[in-house]
């Protein structure tokens, strides 16, 4: 109703079931089809630094099923590896996503929080490169070298926390920007600073 068509969630957010319920109801109430929305979710790879076992190829391959069940979908539009935490399993985790796409359970596949080194691992393994990389990106965190690398390799960039310093989670004392009012100039104006930056750096928002 408000015009939102891209829903971004993740297994670790623990809200896929709620998203699935709301999505099913919204599509029915608004007379929309599945193709009218774009659904992204993410598999958490494990984090050995926090005592979590890394996801194996098999674990990762099977990880899509509970997400689809909770989301009440046959496929997601984009499936991401949430972070590059598991050095020894990263390539196999990516190999599993390639298979998930081949099986038709994800239209596109990608990664999140990856840098050049992590993507070069995939390239060295001879596997298809990610179609997208979701990274923190905003005027205070520009990552110019990574953005250039992703563009050179035709990897779409999806920005998260793109409203910093306007977002509330970065509103501690000393973190607010003196340019906040200037940066609120968005909306339909094609000269909006947000639109200009998005077009300049070929970045979309999560």
What are these regions (language model features)?
Residues 25-35, 71-73, 100-105, 125-129:
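Short helix-capping segments at alpha-helix termini
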């Amino acid at each position: 109703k408000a015009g939102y068509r891209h829903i971004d969630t993740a297994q670790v957010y623990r809200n896929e079931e709620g998203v699935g319920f709301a999505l099913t109801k919204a599509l029915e109430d608004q007379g929309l089809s599945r193709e009218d929305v774009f659904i992204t979710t993410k598999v958490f790879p494990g984090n050995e630094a926090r005592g979590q076992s890394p996801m194996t190829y098999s674990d990762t391959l099977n990880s899509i099923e509970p997400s689809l069940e909770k989301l009440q979908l046959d496929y997601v539009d984009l499936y991401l590896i949430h972070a590059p935490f598991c050095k020894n399993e990263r390539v196999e985790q990516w190999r599993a996503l390639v298979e998930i796409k081949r099986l038709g359970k994800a239209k596109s596949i990608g990664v999140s929080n990856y840098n050049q080194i992590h993507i070069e691992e995939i390239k060295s393994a001879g596997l298809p490169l990610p179609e997208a990389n979701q990274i923190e990106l905003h005027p205070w965190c520009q990552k110019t070298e990574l953005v250039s690398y992703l563009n050179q390799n035709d990897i779409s960039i999806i920005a998260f926390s793109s409203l910093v310093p306007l977002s509330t989670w970065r509103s501690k004392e000393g973190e607010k920007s003196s340019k906040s009012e200037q940066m609120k100039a968005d909306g339909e104006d094609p000269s909006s600073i947000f639109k200009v930056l998005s077009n300049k750096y070929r970045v979309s928002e999560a």
